[in-house]
Amino acid sequence: LGPEGFWPESQGFDVNRGGITRGGPYGGKKYFSPYGNPRLKDGPPGEHLPARLANETVKFIETNREKPFLAYLSFYSVHTPLIARKDLRQKYLAKRKQLDAAAVAGEFSKREHRRRVRTLQAHAVYAGMIEAMDQAVGTVLSGLKRLGLEKNTAVFFMSDNGGLSTSEGHPTSNLPLRGGKGWMYEGGIREPLIVR
């Protein structure tokens, strides 16, 4: 994050694919190619960013498989703007309808610190973004297995903060935890950490 002096290459990384000035996709709504990112060549029209970043990571691992390596993969998912693949968005819209989990009165709790907090987790686009990221993680894990590196490579999966949960159009609910991104409550600072 930040100007060029803060980019990965300036911090000791040898290769940078897609790392740029912000935590979301470069130039706003760029989860699909053309990305318009000076650190990532455009792929075929409509190529999905999480899949592309996973494939770039596997290529890096293939190139460096004979020596110790560090691959640091930061998916822009599920950062705003919220844009999912059409097939996944439709899948989760149907699931929400099946569960009868449409937005209803009471979806937001009473105002807390002049904001209302989302209490219902039923955002189809957000769910689609999560699944696409999960598939991309699977691509990297499959690449490690194919290259015979899965038993000799530590993989860490983590996030940087809790989800946005306030009523300004953001999709997540961190309940039963209090708060979300930007709050010092557990909903803002508790995050996943998986080590394999």
Model-derived features: positions:
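Active-site-proximal cap/lid insertion segments
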Residues: 3-8, 15-196
